[in-house]
């Protein structure tokens, strides 16, 4: 299991040995490797910029992995997509928000597999109010290997509801991995 350090180096943070009928678990040693760290004065501190968040798992043979974590009042399960989850063109998918509620959100995260990966996200409602307070018609950014870029919007703005970000087009010039959905959603 690898993660990037503060100097953008891919660092081995641990390993487990698995075999048929002998699954294992790995406890992430530091939660801020996977969870953003907002503060009262800067609630989007780790959003809308390249950050060293995320994990990369690798093995000698094919295997299945999932990520389970929890924060106060909420648990999350992220399934592994394997090599099928690596590519250069994706569409954002999440549950639509229909209620006016600031605890509901949508999110998309892009993680680079190679240095100097240019990513463009477009084809979404340009009236969306993202949590950084900026409305935009597209995103363009460059990531180093192992870096992530996290986008977030909440349900307390009418332009953010009813699937405004669903179907956003994510295109990169090198392979990336995408995680998207709702940290808090309506189902």
Predicted regions and their residues:
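Intrinsically disordered, low-complexity linker/terminal regions across diverse proteins
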Residues: 1-187
């Amino acid at each position: 299991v690898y993660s990037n350090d503060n100097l953008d180096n891919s660092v081995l943070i641990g390993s487990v040995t698995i075999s048929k009928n002998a699954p294992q678990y790995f406890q992430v040693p530091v939660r801020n490797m996977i969870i953003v760290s907002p503060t009262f004065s800067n609630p989007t501190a780790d959003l809308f910029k390249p950050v060293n968040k995320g994990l990369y798992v690798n093995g000698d043979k094919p295997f299945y992995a999932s990520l389970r974590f929890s924060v106060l009042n909420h648990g999350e399960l992220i399934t592994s997509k394997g090599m099928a989850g690596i590519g250069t063109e994706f569409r954002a998918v999440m549950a639509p928000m229909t209620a006016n509620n600031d605890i509901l959100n949508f999110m998309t995260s892009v993680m680079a597999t190679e240095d100097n990966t240019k990513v463009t996200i477009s084809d979404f409602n340009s009236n969306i109010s993202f949590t950084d307070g900026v409305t935009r018609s597209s995103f363009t950014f460059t990531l180093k290997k192992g870096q992530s870029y996290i986008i977030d919007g909440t349900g307390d703005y009418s332009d953010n509801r009813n699937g405004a970000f669903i179907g956003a087009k994510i295109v990169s010039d090198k392979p990336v991995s995408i995680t998207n959905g709702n940290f808090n959603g309506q189902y």
